Regions:
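N-terminal polyanion-binding entry modules of DNA glycosylases/AP lyases
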Residues: 1-117, 121
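Catalytic DNA-binding helix-loop module of base-excision-repair DNA glycosylases/AP lyases
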Residues: 118-147
Length: 147
């Protein structure tokens, strides 16, 4: 099943039957842009996953937007040349900035074929990147590779 505005609306309708979930749908559905959930640029998608960890949903949205604005016209190589302080200036912690740099470095050097690899192999490959753990690798499989 493809995730698009129509399927998202169906999901909202179904999930809104639960009072607790309905609360979150009402509170956050207007800030969720399904077209920008995760980038097809794998490095950017993993950077977004790193940003989302251990911050509130609302904070993650704000920081991801600032990060996207910062790198929007930059190549991966130019992103790697950014000082960690520049990444921190958009709300990313020093440690997460290091991990994001590791991700971009990996994709600068690697030609790994994620699409033709098994789930287990993709997870093994991703967790070899410092800063990417099992949870991030599994979220990458689900939301980016749609598996």
């Amino acid at each position: 099943m493809e995730l698009n505005p129509e399927t998202l609306k169906k999901a909202y309708n179904y999930l809104s039957k639960d009072d607790c979930l309905n609360h979150f749908i009402i509170k956050f559905s207007d800030v969720i842009d399904i077209t920008e959930r995760y980038s097809v640029n794998y490095a950017k998608a993993l950077a977004d996953l790193i940003i989302e960890q251990q911050v509130s949903f609302k904070a993650a949205i704000t920081i991801k937007k600032r990060f996207s604005d910062l790198i929007s016209n930059l190549s991966n190589n130019e992103i790697l040349e950014l000082k960690l302080e520049m990444l921190q200036s958009v709300g990313i912690s020093y440690r997460k900035a290091e991990y994001i740099r590791n991700v971009y470095m990996y994709f600068q050097e690697s030609k790994y074929d994620f699409n033709s690899s098994s789930n287990e192999d993709v997870i093994s490959e991703l967790i070899s990147i410092k800063g990417i753990g099992l949870w991030s690798a599994q979220m990458f499989l689900i939301f980016v590779l749609m598996r």
